């Protein structure tokens, strides 16, 4: 039996021992060393050859990733590690750190129970570290800390042992402050990372060594030895004495939970069904003999197998030929193949049981976030996976050859299924395909990689367009609106939605709702908690994309029969704002009164939808409407000498500097800029700092467009959309 075959046999055996499984992720800021760490862990566990590790970036197996030197898609791999005489199976997901790919990170968090947070010792805790940690804690994922690039503190920055210590203490305190701030109540103290119990490790992923307090006690190596090895350039010897994989994987096994342990507190948070039901109990206990329940966290498209779904099973087991039911899609599918991951390869297995992460072939229509169960025991779906960012840039895309059009439509649908942070729509008037993403790099990866390289369709990509929103800032008077046949009248008032309610909607605490009957009491309570007037909250008819329609009427005959049509009109008004036909957000529409014709034939869709739509639009025009533009936080890390140039670059783009820190000879600038001004920023900032800065961006919500620009901007958008210019 070759080494590889032994490894596969081991993995198959351990998959059935639930307390010996660890599902973990590695998360960090871009370039802090995630992928190098995961490769060297793989090499240590005998999965790829040692000579290549660190250079090979086994998990960056997409040629585009290897070229750019950044991880774009989350990759999966399984490995075996022995700790205190027992063997453990570790399923590792490497997630991207670049901000344009935040969606991948959020989805990976659903599949794992613990995370190694990697922080670069030189740069410290960065904005993206904070974002990723927040996502982990929100999904109830327990963290441990690995401080990377320690050799650079010793060799490049020449820090003394005292300075080293204070640098480490600062990083650990920063991480613990974030955990205190963001962890769920019951874990605020339990989950803090501590040097003394070994939930913090230090080392150099690139040079393949690491150290932790338990390992020092076990091996007798001290911090002084480490400084000596680094100064004398004998890090390869150090890697033999204190191997990275041993220290880090020991920490993972000791401090991160097994599936049965983690599911006890994760399931109540992730799944809103009845925990006392058969499925609920099976998931809490990670029971392989219970009803099937799993969540699909990612779709990978394979040239040979088609769509491969990455799935975390919470209960039951799944084997080839099984029929499963997809809850969100409401359809059945047959599993053609079940396999586990080893880097870029999938190894077919007979069956997979609860607690494991696997790859399934055969779920053609599945999208990320889908819940799967068995057709005879249908369960409640898992909560929608909430993404922190939303698409802010749109490009028009068309095939260079008309014959590629059907193929292009298929690829765009597939991309939207794989990545929920991408939106694809067809502009009805112009017939263009519009692709929206989270930033320039995100869009470029999709068009160059997924469409041109993988699908082989040459495309023309239009100029990037910024996605604006509309809202109101004042309250309108009561506006009367008549149906086209003049037999029905609706009376509306429009005002801004409470800021706190909009925030709760964005964080996913309040869902989209259409109600024909009474609103679910849970949602009413959430609305009141978020600051809505209790009387209004009880009368909500519809919540749609951050706008709310409230029925303030009393005792109107026939109103129930036209409710759906009024909701339809409200949605149309919210999709096309009055200023520039952009989507609205944060608008509260109240239906104050209605006079309806008693004959149903005179209050059909052709009468009621326009009455609602135009009435709401007129009311918005009298409620001081404004245009909102998307903003981004910009974080720049630059040498002091280039600080002025970097700040000029920001202020030339209507940016505001929010914060500035100095650490050694580096300046850290935190600013906020409109997305509209950020095109071409990558090249400009490189030029301004002679390529010596690191920068990243993060979505920062929508803000009002400056008044002096609004009129011109509305004119431009209307012109682009071919609307009348009045």
Swiss-Prot record:
One of its GO terms (biological process) is translational elongation. The keyword Cytoplasm applies. InterPro entries: EFG_II, EFG_III/V, EFG_V-like, EFTu-like_2, G_TR_CS, P-loop_NTPase, Ribosomal_Su5_D2-typ_SF, Ribsml_uS5_D2-typ_fold_subgr. Signal peptide: none annotated. GTP binds at residues 28-35, 94-98, 148-151. GO terms for cellular component: cytosol; ribonucleoprotein complex. Keywords: Cytoplasm, Elongation factor, GTP-binding, Nucleotide-binding, Protein biosynthesis. It is found in: Cytoplasm. Gene3D superfamilies: 3.30.230.10, 3.30.70.240, Elongation Factor G (Translational Gtpase), domain 3, P-loop containing nucleotide triphosphate hydrolases, Translation factors. The modification Diphthamide is found at residue 602. GO terms for molecular function: GTP binding; GTPase activity; translation elongation factor activity. Residues 19-260 form the tr-type G domain. It comes from the Archaea. Belongs to the TRAFAC class translation factor GTPase superfamily. Classic translation factor GTPase family. EF-G/EF-2 subfamily. PANTHER family: ELONGATION FACTOR-LIKE GTPASE 1, TRANSLATION ELONGATION FACTOR-RELATED. Catalyzes the GTP-dependent ribosomal translocation step during translation elongation. During this step, the ribosome changes from the pre-translocational (PRE) to the post-translocational (POST) state as the newly formed A-site-bound peptidyl-tRNA and P-site-bound deacylated tRNA move to the P and E sites, respectively. Catalyzes the coordinated movement of the two tRNA molecules, the mRNA and conformational changes in the ribosome. This is Elongation factor 2. It comes from Methanocaldococcus jannaschii (strain ATCC 43067 / DSM 2661 / JAL-1 / JCM 10045 / NBRC 100440).
């Amino acid at each position: 039996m070759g080494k590889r075959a032994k490894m596969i046999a081991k993995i198959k055996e351990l998959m059935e021992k639930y307390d010996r499984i660890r599902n973990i992720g590695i998360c960090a800021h871009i370039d802090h060393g995630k992928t190098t760490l995961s490769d060297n862990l793989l090499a240590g566990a005998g999965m790829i050859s040692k000579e290549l590790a660190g250079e090979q970036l086994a998990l960056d197996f997409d040629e585009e990733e290897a070229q750019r030197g950044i991880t774009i898609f989350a990759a999966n791999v399984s490995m075996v590690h022995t700790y205190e005489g027992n063997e453990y199976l570790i399923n590792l997901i490497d997630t991207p750190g670049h901000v344009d790919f935040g969606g991948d990170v959020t989805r990976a968090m659903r599949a794992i129970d613990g995370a190694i947070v990697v922080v670069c010792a030189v740069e410290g805790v960065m904005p993206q570290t904070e974002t990723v940690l927040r996502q982990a804690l929100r999904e109830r994922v327990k963290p441990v800390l690995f401080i990377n690039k320690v050799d650079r503190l010793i060799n490049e920055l020449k820090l003394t042992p005292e300075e080293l210590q204070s640098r480490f203490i600062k990083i650990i305190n920063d991480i613990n402050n974030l955990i205190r701030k963001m962890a769920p109540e019951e874990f605020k103290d339990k989950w803090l990372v501590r040097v003394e119990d070994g939930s913090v490790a230090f080392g150099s992923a690139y040079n393949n060594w690491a150290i932790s307090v338990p390992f020092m006690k076990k091996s007798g190596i001290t911090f002084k030895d480490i400084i000596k090895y680094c100064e004398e350039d004998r890090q390869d010897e150090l890697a033999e004495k204190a191997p990275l994989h041993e220290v880090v994987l020991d920490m993972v096994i000791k401090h991160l939970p097994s599936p049965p342990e983690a599911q006890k507190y994760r399931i109540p948070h992730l799944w809103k069904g009845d925990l006392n039901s058969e499925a609920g109990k099976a998931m809490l206990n990670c029971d392989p003999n219970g009803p099937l329940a799993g969540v699909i966290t990612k779709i990978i498209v394979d040239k040979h197998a088609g769509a491969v779904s990455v799935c975390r099973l919470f209960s039951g087991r799944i084997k080839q030929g099984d029929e499963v039911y997809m809850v969100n899609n409401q359809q059945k599918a047959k599993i053609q193949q079940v396999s586990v991951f080893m880097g870029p390869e999938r190894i077919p297995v007979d069956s997979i049981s609860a607690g494991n992460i696997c790859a399934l072939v055969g779920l053609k229509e599945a999208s990320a976030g889908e819940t799967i169960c068995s057709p005879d025991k249908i369960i409640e779906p898992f909560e929608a996976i909430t993404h922190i960012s939303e698409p802010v840039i749109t490009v028009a895309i068309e095939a260079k050859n008309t014959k590629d059009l059907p193929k292009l439509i298929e690829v765009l649908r597939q991309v939207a299924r794989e990545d929920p942070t991408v939106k694809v729509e067809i502009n009805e008037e112009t017939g263009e395909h519009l692709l929206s993403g989270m930033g320039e790099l995100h869009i470029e990866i999709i068009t160059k990689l997924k469409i041109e390289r993988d699908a082989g369709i040459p495309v023309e990509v239009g100029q990037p367009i910024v996605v604006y929103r509309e809202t109101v800032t004042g309250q309108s008077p009561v506006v009367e609106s008549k149906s086209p046949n003049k037999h029905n009248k609706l009376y509306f008032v429009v005002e801004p939605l409470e800021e706190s309610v909009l925030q709760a909607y964005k964080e996913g605490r309040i869902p989209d709702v259409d109600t024909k009957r009474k609103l679910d009491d849970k949602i009413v309570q959430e609305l009141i908690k978020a600051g809505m007037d209790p009387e209004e909250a009880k009368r909500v008819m519809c919540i749609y994309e951050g706008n709310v329609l409230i029925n303030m009427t009393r005792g109107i005959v026939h109103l129930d029969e036209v409710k759906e049509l009024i909701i339809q009109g409200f949605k149309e008004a919210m999709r096309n704002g009055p200023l520039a036909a952009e989507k609205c957000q944060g608008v509260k529409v109240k239906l104050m009164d209605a006079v309806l014709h008693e004959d149903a034939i005179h209050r059909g869709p052709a009468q009621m939808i326009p009455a609602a739509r135009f009435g709401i639009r007129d009311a918005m025009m009298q409620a001081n409407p404004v245009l909102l533009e998307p903003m981004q936080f910009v974080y720049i890390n630059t040498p002091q000498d280039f600080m002025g140039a970097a700040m000029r670059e920001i202020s030339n783009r209507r940016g505001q500097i929010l914060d500035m820190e100095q650490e050694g000879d580096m300046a850290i600038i935190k600013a906020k800029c409109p997305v509209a001004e950020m095109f071409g920023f990558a090249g400009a900032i490189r030029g301004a700092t002679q390529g010596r800065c690191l920068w990243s961006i993060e979505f920062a919500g929508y803000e009002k467009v400056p008044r002096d620009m609004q009129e011109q901007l509305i004119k431009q958008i209307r012109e682009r959309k071919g609307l009348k210019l009045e």
